[in-house]
């Protein structure tokens, strides 16, 4: 080991899956052919890393998880051989599988080694048999019986094999007979290495107390004379050893605590010491060149040691194959400022079309009518094209005016913006009665005019954006209830209706919230995201919400994309079939996520799974096999329909169709193992137990089946199911009442919770999904009366039960149904709030192994938040998508879709106690989506800060950062900040108003039409400069500084409250602000580089703290534009929290009468 040897690289061992946690490396080895370092983990995966930077090269699942960890890796010119307890696997260095060997007597393999024949290896373990394998053919060529349990093998002059009793056997390379045996250590051998004529071992022995400890000696043996040599002393405990590949008598000896010693076996006094920065070492390996040393430790990391001046794994390595670099197309300088004459024009001899006069342009015909998407499932092939039954949505000989449809607007006109209503309010005071009448008529239109007409409340709803953003949109026009709707303009928001249905099933809601409160931190856990969403919908109390985080997790699943469940894949797929496929995917993923945390619990199966078995019988040989047939979602299977007898034939009742669908019996062609050929087989399902929640897919793929649903009262609101002797009996209506009166045993009553339906109104062209839900079932108050509500994205309104369960309209198609056992009615369980797992708040969590900043101190158990604990919050965001703006012919602009932001940094500070103002959360969030703008001027985030490979900050996934805030919210903390409404919306979390203190509203003057920025308030109150703008593009805001300033402003406001001088302070602040333009004066008389003052709220307001003023429209307008703000700062303070006044920790120096210090001093 040369003098400049040091740690060159440190990388975490990759997680076994995309949403798993890092795991330890069970074995590491340097490739003797290429510049690669290989590592195996406990899940059967082997991964290679290239070069001194340990760049990830390949990763392969070589062994099933059930086979156990990877225990050894060997290298051959043709590939890499790995060994697990039950199998041996060979791959190429690019990751292609060559062969896989498993044998019934391979029960506990531990080691392998090359034999005298270079194309053969021998594998052994703690079992009675050893196997010889031909590498070229990938087959077992010989099986040898042995009386020893071998744990390690090294090939040299002999095949040195270590046993589990602490002995070492020298085996002959020809017949593998024991030539010599030594008792090397008392209990077990931990590591050994053999090279040339020397063998060195490290192991454990039993001392006085009876527990094995590491021997302080490394034993040395001469393989030429088969005799022991003097041992090498190593007082730290010799746990691992490797012989130098070039210096024949030099070896590396290491302890479990990371002490490294390079010693000459022939001269033990010549030693070289190093200390590796590890907590507990698990293994070492040295490269064939002797220039690099690899260490794996218990903290799931791999360390590479060597000389910075020269590091090569091999003397002569083969070139590593990499993927070909895709050539980029030539760059074209194209921008809005590029003149068209730079492109050039071809030579022409005739007049161009663009020069034709207008009187020569004619309309040659209307565009063809688009194919009705509801017809797609019913298409049948013909000699030319396809045909389908006529849906009869138009009258005979009636055609569509397709040219008018392309420009037709939605029948449901969006309401006026809040700012527009505020401006008109003062002008319309004298015409109040007229306005009231208009509003009443608008409400009447929303509820429709006739029973057979498509009601306006079923129309598509779209969010309109003004220059004041989404807060200016009047959501209360669409929702006057206490139940919150979900916003659109989010990818895959077509699932909103299904999410609402799942939320109102009490047992599913309880399952999701209890899981979210557990230890789960898997990044793409849908069950956790459902718990967060359901909690947010309950806390919103009628305010609009969005399922951004859940839908982002849903979009990240490769299975969802492969199955065509994402929005971009729905162009040729009907919404009804898509939502039923999404329903199956959600339920299967919920079950998977639940078992990740509670693998042995059957709580989910009891709630959601139909426990059944499937018997498959061959019709030819009568051979029958039985396999599990559990299902989470059942599809309705309809018999051959005779619509004339549908009303009288009991077989067409919903209950009988449901029974036949649950215990279905079908015939099909399948493979028979007994006949060894495809035969006609019968598949029959036997049900053993029904779930408490019965979720059904309507599966309406036939127009005739659609007529069943049009029968009034065909869908029952309650059903009864009895499972007895493997048979299912289902009842409804009068039959059910008779069964209840007779007190039939094992009868389970189910109530219809709700359903998802597709709305396809031809006049609006665009089909969408809504849900009808009986909200009384999930009510906390016991009530027997049904209360049905329509959830059409963010439009929520109460409807009659008959309207919800009526399907005689051709544009209303049922998709998903949900029944729940009546015993679970009103079963809303909030016990999860008492079992919150708060471990995440008290320990550091890092994705990139980054060291926590010195200014951050993690919470201690003594500082556990309690209800009323104040914390200061500030966040930073980056732009993922720019706003979509429609420029009209008159030059005006309309925001079609706002810019999409991603959470980049979260800082939370203590709001009280001896460490008041000290952050305990300061996390940067890794973002996998493309970032179009880091907005460094406002966020302080620079390129590379959110990349795990280059970031110097503490990086965490969005799930971890979100869960920390969610835990603080449900622990009852009070969030203090500036512009919190914007932050909470972008974080996608709902915080009740009694848990927020927003300094933007504390320092709001009722008579002024302006909200002050945090930057100006810091100067006005404390005479301090923050968020200073600079010409340096890499300088930006600091969220810790902003959160601390908001906390100080709140503490100072409390002092003003106690002194009773709030109004005087606000008057002085606004008077001084008017003189200065509501921005701090230049520092030391030198003007700083400032952008234009914020005099109007714009959609590009990237910082929630520099909030410009509301429009100058008078007091009524201001009140409407700030509907979420309290009437006065005193009311805001009293409504937020009442704490003791500041102890002066944050008191500024102060030079004026009202600014800079406490007025009480």
UniProtKB/Swiss-Prot annotation:
Annotated Pfam families: PAN2_N (PF20770), RNase_T (PF00929), UCH_1 (PF13423)
Catalytic reaction equation(s): Exonucleolytic cleavage of poly(A) to 5'-AMP
Gene coding for it: pan2
The protein's Enzyme Commission number: 3.1.13.4
HAMAP family in alphabetical order: PAN2 (MF_03182)
Organism from which the protein derives: Aspergillus clavatus (strain ATCC 1007 / CBS 513.65 / DSM 816 / NCTC 3887 / NRRL 1 / QM 1276 / 107)
Domain USP, residue spans: 453-822
Composition bias type Gly residues, residue spans: 1145-1155
Enzyme class: hydrolase
DNA damage among keywords: no
Name this protein carries in UniProt: PAN2-PAN3 deadenylation complex catalytic subunit pan2
């Amino acid at each position: 080991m040369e003098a400049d040897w040091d740690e060159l690289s440190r990388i975490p061992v990759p997680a076994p899956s995309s949403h798993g946690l890092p795991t330890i490396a069970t074995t590491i080895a340097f490739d003797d052919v290429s510049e690669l370092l290989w590592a195996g983990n406990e899940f059967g995966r082997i991964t290679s890393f290239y070069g001194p930077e340990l760049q990830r090269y390949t990763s392969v699942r070589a062994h099933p998880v059930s086979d156990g960890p990877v225990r050894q890796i060997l290298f051959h010119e043709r590939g890499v051989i790995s060994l697990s307890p039950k199998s041996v696997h060979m791959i190429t260095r690019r990751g292609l599988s060559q062969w896989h060997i498993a044998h019934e007597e391979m029960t506990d393999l531990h080691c392998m080694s090359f034999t005298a024949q270079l194309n053969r290896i021998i594998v052994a373990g703690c079992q009675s048999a050893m196997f010889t394998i031909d590498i070229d053919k990938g087959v077992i060529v010989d099986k040898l019986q042995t009386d020893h349990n071998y744990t390690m093998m090294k090939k040299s002059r002999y095949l040195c094999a270590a046993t589990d009793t602490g002995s070492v056997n020298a085996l002959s390379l020809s017949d593998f007979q024991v030539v010599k045996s030594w008792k090397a250590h008392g209990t077990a051998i931990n590591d050994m290495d053999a090279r040339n004529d020397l063998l060195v071992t490290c192991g454990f022995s039993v001392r006085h107390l009876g527990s094995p400890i590491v021997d302080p000696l490394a034993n040395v043996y001469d393989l030429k004379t088969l005799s022991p040599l003097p041992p090498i002393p190593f007082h730290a405990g010799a746990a691992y050893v490797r012989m130098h590949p070039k210096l024949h008598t030099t070896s590396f000896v290491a302890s479990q605590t990371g002490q490294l010693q390079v010693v000459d076996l022939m001269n033990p006094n010549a030693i070289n010491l190093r200390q590796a920065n590890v907590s507990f070492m698990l293994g070492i390996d040295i490269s064939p060149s002797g220039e690099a040393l690899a260490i794996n430790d218990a903290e799931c990391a791999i360390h590479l040691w060597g000389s910075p001046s020269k590091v090569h794994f091999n003397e002569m390595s083969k070139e590593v194959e990499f993927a070909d670099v895709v050539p980029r197309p030539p760059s074209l300088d194209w921008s809005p400022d590029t003149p068209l004459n730079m492109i050039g024009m071809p030579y022409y001899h005739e007049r161009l079309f663009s020069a034709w006069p207008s009187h020569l342009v004619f309309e040659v015909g209307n565009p063809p009518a688009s194919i009705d998407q509801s017809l797609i499932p019913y298409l049948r092939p013909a000699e030319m094209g396809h045909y389908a039954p006529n849906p009869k949505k138009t009258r005979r000989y009636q055609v569509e005016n397709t040219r008018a449809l392309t420009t037709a607007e939605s029948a449901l006109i969006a309401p006026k913006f809040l700012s527009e209503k505020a401006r008109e309010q003062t002008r319309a005071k004298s015409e109040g009665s007229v306005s009231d009448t208009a509003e009443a008529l608008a409400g009447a239109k929303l509820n429709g005019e006739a029973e057979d007409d498509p009601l306006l409340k079923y129309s598509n709803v779209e969010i309109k954006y003004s220059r004041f953003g989404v807060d200016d949109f009047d959501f209360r026009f669409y929702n006057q209830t206490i139940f919150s709707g979900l916003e659109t303009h989010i990818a895959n928001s077509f699932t909103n209706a299904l999410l609402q249905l799942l939320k109102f099933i009490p047992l599913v809601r309880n399952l999701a919230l209890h899981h979210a409160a557990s230890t789960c931190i898997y990044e793409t856990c849908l069950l956790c995201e459902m718990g967060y969403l359901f909690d947010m919908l309950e806390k919103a109390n009628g305010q609009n919400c969005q399922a951004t985080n859940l839908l982002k997790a849903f979009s990240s699943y490769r299975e969802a994309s492969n199955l065509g469940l994402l929005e971009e894949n729905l162009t040729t797929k009907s919404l009804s079939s898509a939502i039923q496929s999404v329903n199956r995917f959600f339920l299967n993923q919920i079950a998977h996520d639940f078992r990740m945390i509670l693998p042995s619990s059957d709580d989910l199966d009891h709630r959601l799974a139909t426990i059944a078995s499937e018997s498959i019988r061959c019709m030819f040989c009568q051979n029958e096999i039985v396999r599990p047939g559990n299902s989470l979602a059942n599809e309705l299977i309809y018999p051959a329909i005779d619509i004339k007898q549908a009303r009288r034939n009991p077989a067409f009742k919903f209950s009988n169709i449901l029974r036949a669908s649950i215990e279905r019996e079908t015939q099909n062609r399948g493979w028979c193992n007994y006949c060894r050929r495809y035969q006609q087989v019968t598949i029959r399902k036997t049900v053993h137990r029904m779930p408490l929640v019965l979720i059904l897919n309507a599966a309406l793929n036939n127009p005739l089946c659609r007529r069943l649903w049009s029968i009034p009262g065909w869908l029952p609101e309650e059903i009864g199911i009895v499972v007895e002797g493997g048979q299912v009996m289902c009842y409804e209506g009068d039959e059910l009442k008779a069964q209840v009166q007779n007190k039939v045993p094992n009868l389970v009553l189910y109530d219809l919770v709700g359903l998802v339906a597709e709305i396809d109104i031809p006049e609006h062209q665009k089909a969408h999904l809504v849900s009808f839900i009986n909200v009384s079932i999930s009510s906390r108050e016991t009530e027997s009366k049904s209360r049905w509500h329509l959830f059409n994205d963010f439009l929520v309104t109460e409807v009659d039960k008959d309207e919800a369960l009526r399907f005689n309209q051709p544009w209303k198609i049922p998709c998903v149904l949900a029944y729940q056992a009546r015993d679970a009615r009103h079963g809303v369980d909030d016990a999860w709030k008492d079992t919150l797992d708060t471990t995440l708040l008290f320990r550091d969590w890092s994705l990139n192994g980054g060291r926590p900043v010195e200014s951050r101190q993690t919470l201690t158990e003594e500082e556990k938040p309690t209800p009323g604990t104040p914390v200061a919050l500030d966040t930073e965001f980056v732009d993922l998508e720019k706003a979509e703006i429609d420029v009209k012919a008159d030059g005006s602009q309309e925001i079609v879709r706002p810019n999409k932001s991603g959470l980049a940094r979260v800082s939370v500070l203590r709001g009280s106690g001896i460490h008041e103002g000290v952050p305990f959360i300061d996390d940067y969030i890794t973002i996998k989506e493309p970032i179009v703008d880091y907005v460094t001027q406002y966020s302080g985030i620079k390129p590379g800060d959110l990349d795990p490979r280059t970031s110097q900050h503490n990086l965490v996934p969005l799930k971890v950062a979100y869960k920390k805030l969610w835990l603080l919210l449900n622990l009852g903390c009070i969030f203090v900040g500036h512009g919190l409404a914007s932050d909470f919306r972008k974080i996608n979390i709902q915080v009740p108003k009694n848990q927020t203190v927003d300094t933007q509203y504390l320092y709001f003057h009722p008579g002024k039409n302006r909200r002050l920025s945090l930057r100006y308030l810091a100067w006005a109150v404390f005479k301090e400069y923050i968020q200073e703008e600079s010409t340096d593009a890499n300088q930006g805001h600091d969220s810790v500084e902003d959160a601390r300033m908001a906390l100080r402003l709140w503490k100072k406001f409390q002092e003003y409250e106690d002194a009773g001088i709030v109004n005087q302070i606000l008057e002085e602040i606004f008077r001084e602000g008017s003189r200065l333009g509501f921005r701090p004066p230049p520092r030391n008389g030198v003007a700083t580089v400032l952008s234009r003052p914020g005099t109007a709220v714009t959609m590009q307001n990237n910082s929630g703290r520099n909030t410009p003023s509301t429009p100058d429209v008078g007091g009524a307008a201001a009140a409407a534009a700030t509907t979420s703000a309290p009437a006065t700062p005193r009311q805001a303070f009293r409504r937020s929290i009442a704490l003791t006044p500041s102890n002066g920790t944050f008191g500024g120096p102060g030079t004026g009468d009202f600014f800079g210090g406490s007025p009480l001093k």
